[in-house]
Amino acid sequence: GSEMCIRDRPDTFDPKSSKRNFKLSLGDVSEGRVLPFIMKEIYADSKNISVGSFAYQRSDQVHALATNNLDFVVDPIIPRSDEINSEKVFEDDFVVMYREGHDLSKIKDVSVDDILDQKHLHVSNRRRGLHLIDTELEKIGYRREVALRCQHFLIAPTIIQSTDLVLMGTRSFANRNNLPFAEIPLDIPSMEYFLIWHKNDEGDGGHIWMKDLIVRAFKHAQR
């Protein structure tokens, strides 16, 4: 049908000449994980392709995908809809990170008590967002002392490096920011991230190309 003219058939999509704009909804941490990799690849091979990353409420994601306002969503939660497909692209577990030379770095097997003796940095952009970690701690009757609560992960490394605050966050975040860390001796569920797209986009050449690039970007971040 005429729909096909708007989108690229697999045999007509050429990343080298395409001027397509891909619209993604990634969230703060995923942006940091994959956008540098994606843009490096695009810059090397497909200079006319552009990418936008937008924040969408979960309740608006499916509609945005259905109306081509979004090409892909990356989220820990898969929306309930039979219009979409998804694939797990990333799994990350939690560690406690700190500055070089921190007291925790001198302890061989860090215990939950050792971690909770510290003052914590807590990152959350939800007004009352209870973190996965706090939920697990509460189950065993523990609470952490939060000395600073901020909204964005961007400033976390600077604060950790220049104070004695510790941060419970993902292993990949610690690795990417060269922050020393210790394992948390608790059974905390790991974070899973899913790549989510609309079924109507399958078979579209540009969509196939971008999906492959996003999957590779997450594989690269998992290292």
Where are these regions (language model features)?
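Short, well-ordered beta-strand segments
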Residues: 21-25, 73, 97, 121, ...
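Short, small-residue-biased leader/transition segments that mark boundaries at the very start
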Residues: 1-6
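Short loop->beta-strand "edge-of-pocket" segments that line small-molecule binding or catalytic clefts
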Residues: 23-25, 94, 110-130, 218
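Hydrophobic hinge/microswitch elements
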Residues: 57-70, 76, 126-180
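Secondary-structure junction motif
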Residues: 104-105, 118-140, 203-211, 221
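Flexible hinge/capping segments at coil-to-helix
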Residues: 81-120, 205-208
